[in-house]
Design a protein with these regions (language model features):
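Structural motif
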Residues: 30-31, 111-115, 146, 187
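Hydrophobic h-region of N-terminal signal peptides that target proteins for export
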Residues: 10-18
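Bacterial N-terminal signal peptides that target proteins for export
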Residues: 1-6
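Catalytic nucleophile loop
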Residues: 113-116, 135-159
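C-terminal and late-domain segments of enzyme folds
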Residues: 20-52, 63, 68, 77-79, ...
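Glycine/threonine-rich flexible loop motifs
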Residues: 119-128
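ATP/NTP phosphate-donor binding region
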Residues: 46, 54-105
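Catalytic-core regions built around general acid/base machinery
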Residues: 105-108, 129-142
Length: 269
């Protein structure tokens, strides 16, 4: 009787574990802190996006409307000639973003890059629409999601500097939600160059379950299979309130090449 009971338990436990594995995204993230995009970072993005066999989608929506070319042209630093197909996806209208026709290019996408600018513009256009769901689908099926500056911040679940009134406001009511490709995270950029490191502290104090990530310029965090690795020139600051102790620094640095397990929040060898 005991063995039969154990067998029945396994019938329930094993499928549940497999379901968890199946639901994990198969894709990758390239979260870039702004400034120079190094050869190492862009080469890795192209590789993960399948290069000549891939389809790059460029999303310039965080840019302003002053320079129309920035909303219609893929920038040269992404080396679009390395991809088999390239598309630009942009609208300011959530109603358009919620249509089947608008998301058609995303059905074959292997790589998405979000531009810099102001992150609220991207979230106002796409959050809660079919486009946002299609972005997630690209990531879940194995594509790479990349972005720099504002395009880094939108990849977190909590949106910092999302206020239309100004990017010095870290928490703005009505503009607190990112796409959540990296769950339970808040992502800042230009961290060291612009002396922004302390700006993340009140965010994590208010929302201690979040992992705070502050990335410097010319530096990126690659996320693959639950592991984060630092690429580029400088470093990434990590804020984990669950490990804060009185009198100790509120963040520590991941240096170039270091790896970090996101589930356990531990450095990897």
């Amino acid at each position: 009787m005991k063995s039969r009971t154990l067998a029945l338990l396994w019938l329930f436990v094993i499928p549940s574990a497999r379901a968890g594995e199946d639901s994990a995204p198969k894709g990758h993230l390239i979260i870039h802190g702004g400034g120079q995009l190094t050869t190492e970072v862009i080469d890795r993005f192209i590789e993960l996006g399948r290069g000549a066999e891939g389809h790059l989608i460029y999303v310039p929506t965080s840019n302003g409307d002053e320079d129309g070319k920035s909303l219609t042209t893929v920038p040269g630093y992404l080396r679009p000639e390395k991809f088999g197909k390239v598309s630009v996806l942009h609208t300011r209208d959530p109603k358009i973003a919620d249509t089947d026709g608008f998301i058609e290019p995303l059905k074959t996408a292997t790589a998405i890059w979000f531009s810099g600018g102001r992150q609220w513009r991207t979230m106002d256009a796409y959050l809660g629409t079919k486009t946002a769901a299609a972005f997630q689908a690209v990531y879940r099926r194995g594509g790479v999601i990349g972005g720099s500056s504002a395009g880094a911040t939108v990849q977190g679940s909590f949106l910092v500097r999302g206020a239309p009134a100004g990017n010095q406001i870290m928490m703005a009511e009505g503009h607190l939600e990112g796409f959540g490709f990296l769950p339970d995270s808040a992502i800042d950029q230009h961290a060291i160059v612009r002396k922004r490191l302390d700006d993340m502290i009140p965010v994590i104090e208010t929302h201690p379950h979040l992992l705070g990530i502050a990335i410097d310029e010319a530096t990126a965090l690659e996320v693959s299979g639950g592991c984060a690795r630092v690429l580029g020139k400088t470093k990434v600051a990590i804020f984990d309130a669950q490990r804060w102790k009185k009198g100790e620094p509120r963040y520590f640095f991941l240096e170039k090449g270091q790896r970090y397990a996101l589930a356990t929040r531990q450095l990897l060898p």
